């Protein structure tokens, strides 16, 4: 059986694709389960009337300011709809924005018959899923501690969870590459967890503050001490809305004086933009290979700069006015010959792109009605 949130924002399209595949392979009676209810866009007006304000997790803002710009409103739902499909005999279950760990909790709860308020077992199921949900990341992928010594990363395996009565163990298939060790599990265990004593999920509030992670064999780690508390009364809601427009332009410069030339080129571009009267809401200038990731804490010392083989200038312009973002585009290409020496295109000609922003918030749990469905193929 397969449980997946591959439905995204087009669950029906995903279901239809699976149906066509199954019927194309003469699979009559194949049961496709699918879960609806995570899309609550049509419920937003009533929730606002009821007094729900949709506060933004990241910054102060008025939700009403984006109402006419909203594209999607999708809730992180839990395991219930998935379990419902399994109970109806589904061979595959498709969801939209279900929490990743819920995909693993649902078959565990269904198979073992855990009660809806068995918080400790639900928490164990969630954390087992949490260690599996990112695939190879739980078996040595994206492994910071000792990445050089991960065996056969080109054949990276996925982690496997084996549950006992009060613990669970993480391992992998023996013929796959990767590594399962205490440190690799710790990195994935804490991934996306802001408060170890209160890891909020749609299904349970998980407490891993006293959890144990112990190597018990080759590529085998035991997890114990995971506890659960009642689930939250709200669910996370991700609202996607139109924010504006952006243009990202890049030029690469070769040694010698790569950074100095890139920096001077940025000055030239900005002077040209001033003459064109560009009115941008934000302009971000960075240098790939130097500070595009580390920003203000990057090492920009003379020693770090003087022997660079190459440097890529990146200029990003953001505006609510699409035409303002377009002004920079025709000025980039000529600078290969009409600017500092040693320049070349990086990534092709720039284009104006729409910016879809995220409004992360919560919604009352009782405002979300999750439903399970079964479509049976008939070849």
Predicted features by range, described:
Residues 28-32, 138-153, 196-215, 272-288, ...:
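Flexible, glycine/charged-enriched surface loops at secondary-structure junctions
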């Amino acid at each position: 059986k397969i449980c997946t949130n591959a439905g995204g924002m087009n669950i029906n399209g995903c279901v239809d694709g699976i149906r066509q595949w199954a019927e194309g392979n003469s699979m009559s009676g194949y049961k496709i389960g699918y879960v609806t209810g995570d899309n609550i866009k049509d419920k937003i007006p009533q929730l606002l009337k009821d007094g729900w304000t949709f506060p933004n997790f990241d910054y102060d803002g008025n939700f009403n300011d984006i109402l006419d710009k909203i594209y999607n409103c999708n809730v992180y739902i839990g395991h219930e709809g998935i379990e419902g499909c399994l109970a109806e005999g589904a061979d595959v279950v498709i969801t939209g924005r279900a929490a990743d760990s819920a995909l693993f909790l649902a078959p565990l709860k269904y198979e073992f018959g855990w009660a809806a308020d068995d918080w400790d077992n639900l928490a164990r199921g969630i954390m087992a899923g949490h260690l599996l949900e990112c695939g190879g990341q739980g078996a040595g992928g994206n492994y910071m501690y000792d990445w050089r010594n991960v065996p056969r990363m080109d054949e990276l395996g996925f982690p496997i969870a084996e549950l006992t009565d009060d613990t669970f163990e993480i391992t992998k298939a023996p013929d796959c590459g990767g590594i399962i060790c205490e440190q690799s599990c710790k990195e994935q265990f804490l991934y996306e967890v802001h408060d170890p004593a209160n890891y909020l999920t749609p299904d349970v509030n998980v407490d891993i503050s006293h959890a144990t992670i112990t190597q018990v064999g080759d590529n085998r780690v035991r997890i114990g001490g995971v506890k659960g508390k009642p689930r939250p009364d709200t669910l996370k809601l991700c609202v996607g809305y139109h924010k504006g427009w952006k243009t990202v332009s890049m030029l690469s410069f070769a040694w010698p004086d790569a950074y100095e030339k890139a920096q001077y080129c940025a000055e030239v571009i900005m002077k040209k933009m001033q003459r064109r009267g560009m009115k941008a809401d934000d302009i971000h200038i960075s240098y790939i290979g130097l500070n595009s990731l580390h920003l203000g804490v990057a090492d920009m010392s003379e020693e770090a700069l003087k022997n660079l083989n190459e440097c890529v200038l990146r200029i990003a312009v953001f505006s609510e006015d699409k035409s303002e973002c377009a002004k920079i585009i025709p000025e980039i290409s000529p600078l290969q010959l009409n600017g500092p020496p040693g320049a070349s295109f990086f990534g092709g000609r720039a284009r104006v792109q729409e910016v879809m922003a995220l409004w992360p918030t919560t919604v009352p749990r009782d405002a979300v009605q999750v439903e399970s469905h079964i479509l049976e193929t008939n070849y």
